[in-house]
């Protein structure tokens, strides 16, 4: 029993240290920057982290507000209130990883997903999660919510080798994004959690049931 109590105490201390590190980073590392330079998105603390911007771009202004609202509700309900990461989600992820000896879970905010898509691998580890939080925080500071949403919709992985709404809508529905029906757009958002789990036919069927 004592052994179990000491293990839980260790886990709680570990989580406390992690959150303190996040807060310290937020307060004392103002040099973190994400900038658009010419046609590239650059993460300044590491100049090697430079991402070309795609040409098949869909402006946020071209997407109906109802569709944007749906995206946020499905992918990240607290998107407009957090600073790029969710402490509660990080907490539950770390608890699961430490107590049950699992790899750290991939659940992330929209901003963290964008950080991972643009600058990081899909490896599930504490170090990658820490970098993800740093970059997400920088994205929030430099780009703002609407720009983050626009970048997210244009870069997120939609399965079958498709990145971004333009490629996804053309692959799954053979349409430009602006010609999609709302139920088709909803189907595309629904598959984002496990994009490679769906075939084109399954996505079309899903759209008919929404």
Language-model-derived ranges and their functions:
Residues 1-210:
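Juxtamembrane regions of bacterial inner-membrane/periplasmic proteins
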């Amino acid at each position: 029993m004592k052994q179990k109590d000491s293990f839980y105490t260790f886990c709680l201390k570990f989580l406390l240290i992690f959150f303190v590190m996040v807060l310290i980073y937020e307060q004392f590392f103002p040099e973190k920057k994400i900038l658009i330079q010419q046609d590239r998105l650059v993460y300044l603390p590491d100049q090697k982290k430079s991402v070309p911007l795609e040409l098949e771009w869909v402006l946020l202004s071209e997407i109906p507000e109802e569709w944007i609202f749906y995206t946020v509700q499905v992918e990240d309900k607290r998107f407009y209130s957090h600073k790029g990461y969710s402490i509660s989600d990080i907490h539950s992820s770390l608890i699961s990883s430490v107590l049950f000896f699992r790899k750290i879970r991939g659940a992330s905010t929209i901003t963290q997903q964008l950080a991972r898509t643009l600058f990081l691998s899909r490896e599930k580890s504490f170090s990658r999660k820490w970098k993800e939080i740093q970059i997400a925080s920088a994205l929030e500071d430099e780009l703002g919510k609407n720009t983050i949403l626009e970048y997210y919709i244009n870069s997120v992985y939609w399965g079958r080798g498709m990145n971004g709404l333009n490629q996804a809508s053309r692959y799954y529905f053979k349409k430009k994004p602006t010609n999609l029906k709302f139920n088709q757009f909803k189907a595309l958002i629904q598959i984002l959690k496990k994009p490679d789990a769906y075939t084109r036919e399954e996505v079309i069927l899903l759209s008919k049931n929404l």
